[in-house]
UniProtKB/Swiss-Prot annotation:
SUPFAM superfamilies: P-loop containing nucleoside triphosphate hydrolases. GO terms for cellular component: cell projection; cytoplasm; cytoplasmic vesicle; cytoskeleton; cytosol; plasma membrane; rhabdomere; ruffle. PROSITE patterns: RHO. This is Ras-related protein Rac1. It comes from the Eukaryota. GTP binds at residues 10-17, 57-61, 115-118.
Amino acid sequence: MQAIKCVVVGDGAVGKTCLLISYTTNAFPGEYIPTVFDNYSANVMVDAKPINLGLWDTAGQEDYDRLRPLSYPQTDVFLICFSLVNPASFENVRAKWYPEVRHHCPSTPIILVGTKLDLRDDKNTIEKLRDKKLAPITYPQGLAMAKEIGAVKYLECSALTQKGLKTVFDEAIRSVLCPVLQPKSKRKCALL
């Protein structure tokens, strides 16, 4: 069985842990718990191939900036996550997460993931953002960011409703099984 290592990065509280727990257990967790490193492993079938998907959670908080890259070696695919209802987390894709991932892993495929899709149309959430003169991130904005950072895909999902959730991980696996660019290199992340 082929093993694939998928590392999930992004700002604190964008929903990385919920994404993983909801996907691996089919249940949405309750309270917000900051993460250091939780690893999940799931055996899945994608395109009739059995895959052992190793899912690595990371902490987005700045306190972990020096620890986090320790989980990057041998990564096959990165999910860079931001919350669709947190414009600052979206900006940090460009300002922090893309540069960090590319510094350590120059050619590992990236999938850009907009989380909390269920809240984009939530009246209370929209009002709170409007009070700060902000708005939820739109699909075209996400697509443009994915293009800018050279992500292989842009996907949106909700860990709460599970809409688009399975697709995120299926596409992560496909990006490794059917690489779009540089098929000759092994595309593994190395620590120099």
